[in-house]
């Protein structure tokens, strides 16, 4: 394996700069929301950060299907972390 390669094993970085049309297709990575999710509920937050990084790598390689799939997964784990945090707080308030 070449040491100059970046990203996941199945992805090859582009050997040219991305065109403005390609840049329009960038999937959102929700990195700030993923950081908040990591603070609120660590297990789902870590997964959200992981898929956010995968989204960035897929965007850089113009692999739009993977980018949008990982972006969706990032958002789901962000929402799960927030719901889990609210649920834990709700249970703690009911018990105490």
Curated annotation (Swiss-Prot):
GO BP term, example: binding of sperm to zona pellucida
Gene symbol of the encoding locus: Pmis2
Originating species: Mus musculus (Mouse)
This protein's record includes keyword Membrane: yes
Function in brief: May play a role in spermatozoa mobility.
Record keyword Membrane present: yes
A GO CC term attached to the entry: membrane
Membrane topology: Multi-pass membrane protein
Tissue expression pattern: Specifically expressed in testis.
Family: Belongs to the CD225/Dispanin family.
Keywords: Membrane, Transmembrane, Transmembrane helix
Protein name: Transmembrane protein PMIS2
Compartments (UniProt record): Membrane
Record field: transmembrane: 31-51, 76-96
